[in-house]
Each structure stands twice: as C-alpha cells, then as structure tokens.
C-alpha cells in the first residue's frame, strides 16, 4: 500500500449475527472517502471476488464487485504460482481490501488483503452464494457502482452464513438487485397507482409493474395473489403460497430481463434444493 492515500477506517460494515445485541449507534456517521493515489491508481477498496479464470501461464483474471467502482476485471499476476500469497486471499465470499492500477478495461491488481469478520459458506448456503454471484455478473455492467447493492450483498452472505432460510434470503437479494440495476420492483401499488389488495389477483408487467390480472395479459405471465406481493414487499415469507408464488414470479422476471439466457446455478438450485 502507498502512504499517499488514507485507508478507509471501516471499509466493511459486517452485519451482526442473528440474535446478537445491537451495538450503540454513533452520534455522527463518519464521512466516507474513496482512497486513491492518482487518477489511475485505486487503493484499499472494499470488494469481493465474484469469479476468476486462468490468464496466461501463472496469472488469474478476477471479476470483482467493489463498493465504489462497481464490477471490474483485474489481472492477478503470478496468482497461480504454488507459493503466491494471493492464492489464499482471492477467495469468493470473503471481504477483501483491493488495490489496482491501470485505465484499460483489464486493470492490474497491486494489492489484496483479507479483511475477515465473516463466516465461510457451506452446503446450501454455498450454492446460494454462487447463484448470487452469477446474478451480479449478469446484471451489473462494468464500472457501474451500486453501493447499496454492495452492502446488501454483504448482508446476504452474512444471512446465508448464519443459516437463515435460503428462500427468503434469495428473494430479498433478487429484488434489491433488480431495483438497483434499473428495474422497477414496487409491489404494493399498481401501474394505475392503486393500492394492491390482498384478496385480488395480479400480474407483474416486466416493463411497467403490477397490473390487474385481466383477460388481456399474455398467458405466460404468472398470476400472483395480492397477499403474495404485499408479503414480498415486507420480506415476509411465512406463508406457503408466498414462497411458491414469489419463486415463480422472480424466475419469470429474471428470465425476461436476461433475454432467456439460462443461469447455470439456478438450474442446480432447482434440481437439488428447489430454491
């Protein structure tokens, strides 16, 4: 690291474990800055590895999600060498402090440190984490930062690591992802600006939003109960109907917005866990 840029004093706000007592709230929120050494050198940026693949003989290209710079591609030189310090650091689902340089689409990683503070994912939670990563790669354009989405991804990993129900965690993440990347996800009001009623039936127009389920809607649009939409708005998935219909709705929307491009991890979840 260089001394020309001050490090962010608390780059990750890791959520507490479920049931843990809340910490005292500070009187004033500290001002956050983006450390950088020059126009094309970024220092100590909070980030996560989403995906990596081999590059030349000894290096890797890592696709990372960063808090203030969005999704970027970095060359990790020498990371494939047996004794490289980067081999154990550049892991998915672990908070990192990343530094890089360059101005092309493919930048050069100059530093990576493990921040810690998060439990590893395993089992179903690990599959869900890979699914979330694939969605981020598909929906997030390069260098298009979404700090709220970055924070929600951190929350999602924390919830999965602590054993919260994957169905609820994934539906919440999917909704935030669509909202932050430009897709309207208001579920409590219709396109006609009327409040959604629990006892009525609706459809979700991918281009406009919630509509009444009348005879002129395309037959492949799933019909959803108003109660389901209201439950999803509140992240309440205790009703079996809400669990089933929310899964159908989100599959429909994700498939539509991706132009029919299949998600590899989604099929695994369908086959193994029905998530």
UniProtKB/Swiss-Prot annotation:
Pfam families: RecO_C (PF02565), RecO_N (PF11967). One of its GO terms (biological process) is double-strand break repair. One of its GO terms (cellular component) is bacterial nucleoid. Keywords: DNA damage, DNA recombination, DNA repair. It comes from the Bacteria. InterPro entries: ARFGAP/RecO (IPR037278), DNA_rep/recomb_RecO_N (IPR022572), NA-bd_OB-fold (IPR012340), RecO (IPR003717), RecO_C (IPR042242). Residues 1-36 are annotated as: Disordered. Belongs to the RecO family. Involved in DNA repair and RecF pathway recombination. NCBIfam families: reco (TIGR00613). This is DNA repair protein RecO. The gene is recO.
């Amino acid at each position: 690291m260089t001394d020309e840029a001050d490090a962010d004093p608390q780059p990750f706000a890791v959520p507490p474990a479920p049931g843990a007592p809340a910490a005292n709230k500070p009187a004033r929120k500290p001002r956050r800055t983006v450390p950088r050494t020059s126009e094309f050198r970024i220092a100590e940026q909070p980030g996560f590895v989403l995906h990596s693949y081999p590059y030349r003989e000894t290096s890797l290209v890592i696709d990372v999600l960063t808090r203030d710079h969005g999704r970027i591609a970095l060359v990790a030189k020498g990371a494939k060498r047996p004794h490289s310090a980067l081999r154990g650091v550049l892991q998915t689902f672990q908070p990192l402090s990343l530094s890089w340089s360059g101005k092309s689409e493919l930048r050069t990683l100059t530093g990576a440190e493990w921040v810690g503070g998060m439990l590893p994912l395993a089992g179903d939670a690990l599959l869900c984490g890979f699914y979330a990563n694939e969605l981020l790669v598909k929906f997030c354009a390069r260098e298009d930062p979404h700090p709220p989405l970055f924070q929600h991804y951190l929350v999602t990993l924390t919830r999965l690591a602590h054993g919260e129900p994957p169905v609820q965690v994934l539906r919440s993440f999917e909704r935030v992802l669509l909202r932050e990347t430009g897709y309207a996800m208001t579920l409590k009001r219709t396109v006609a600006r009327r409040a959604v009623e629990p006892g009525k039936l609706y459809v979700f127009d991918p281009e406009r939003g919630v509509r009444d389920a009348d005879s002129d809607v395309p037959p492949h649009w799933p019909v959803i109960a108003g109660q389901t939409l209201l439950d999803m708005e509140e992240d309440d998935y205790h009703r079996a109907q809400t669990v089933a219909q929310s899964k159908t709705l989100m599959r429909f929307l994700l498939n539509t917005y991706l132009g029919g491009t299949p998600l590899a991890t989604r099929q695994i979840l369908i086959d193994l866990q029905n998530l």
